[in-house]
């Protein structure tokens, strides 16, 4: 993309160059407060699965992103999605969240994370999947579930959506699970929410669900938990 060396004024929501050619269009302040992600349709003229794995597929699409122009090629992984859980206990102002340390081979690092797992059972309710992961990874059950935040893990290269739940009112699970592979060596810690926030801002935590979950939980607490959504709230997924 060619670099533009000029800086034009913003007039009536439009950034213009000295020749008054429209370059960028801005929403009005009134419209900006209502922005929301949404599905949009673009014509795919050709699609092929380049490679299939146990969890993800590599897909190559030829897609028309600008009407009237030739299709462009986009390669991405097709992923079933995942859920994660911020597990919280403690009195107001002294909340603690559960963190677990797990080896992640692709990045060759042991990361402090929150419980999480794949949506690899077709049609399964995301909350049910999150409840299963909490029981399997931490031997706990939660009686209160809310949606904390939703995001796409890497929307430029993957279809993977991820929903983070906030789980409270905890109790021990009836069954203790045998953990295998990387999960067999996990370590656990109850971390004060304020300390977890410091860890994120200090660059000590790198797992995206943990980072986003900590930031969202801290923000939600600061707003009195008023913005939490019900566990079955709508979810933008591909």
Give the role of each language-model region.
Residues 13-33, 37-38, 42, 110, ...:
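Nudix hydrolase/Nudix homology domain
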Residues 25-27, 41, 74-79, 86, ...:
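Conserved Nudix-box catalytic region and its N-terminal flanking loop in Nudix hydrolases
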Residues 46-86:
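Acidic, metal-coordinating catalytic segment for phosphate/diphosphate chemistry
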Residues 57-62, 110, 161-163, 187:
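Short beta-strand micro-motifs in enzyme catalytic cores
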Residues 60-62, 87-89, 166-168, 190-192:
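Short, well-ordered beta-strand micro-motif
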Residues 62-67, 154-174:
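Active-site-adjacent beta-strand/loop module that shapes the phosphate/pyrophosphate-binding cleft
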Residues 141-148:
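A short coil-to-beta-strand element that immediately follows conserved catalytic motifs
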């Amino acid at each position: 993309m060619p670099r533009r060396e000029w800086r034009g004024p913003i007039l009536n929501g439009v950034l213009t160059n000295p020749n008054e050619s429209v370059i960028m269009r801005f929403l009005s302040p009134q419209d900006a407060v209502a922005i929301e992600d949404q599905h949009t349709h673009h014509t795919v003229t050709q699609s092929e699965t380049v490679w299939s794995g146990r969890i993800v597929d590599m897909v190559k699409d030829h897609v028309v992103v600008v009407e009237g122009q030739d299709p462009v090629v986009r390669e991405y992984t097709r992923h079933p999605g995942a859920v994660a859980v911020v597990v919280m206990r403690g009195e107001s102002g002294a909340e603690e969240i559960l963190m677990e340390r797990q080896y992640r081979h692709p990045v060759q690092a042991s990361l402090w994370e929150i419980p999480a797992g794949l949506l690899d059972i077709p049609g399964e309710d995301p909350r049910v999947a999150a409840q299963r992961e909490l029981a399997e990874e931490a031997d706990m059950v939660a009686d209160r579930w809310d949606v904390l935040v939703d995001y796409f893990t890497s929307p430029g290269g993957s279809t993977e959506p991820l929903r983070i739940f906030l789980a409270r009112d905890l109790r021990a699970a009836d069954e203790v699970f045998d953990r295998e592979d990387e999960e067999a060596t996990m370590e656990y810690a109850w971390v004060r929410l304020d300390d977890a926030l410091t860890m994120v801002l200090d660059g000590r935590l790198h797992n995206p669900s943990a980072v986003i979950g900590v930031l969202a939980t801290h923000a939600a607490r600061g707003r009195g938990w008023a913005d939490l959504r019900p566990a079955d709230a709508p979810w933008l997924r591909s």
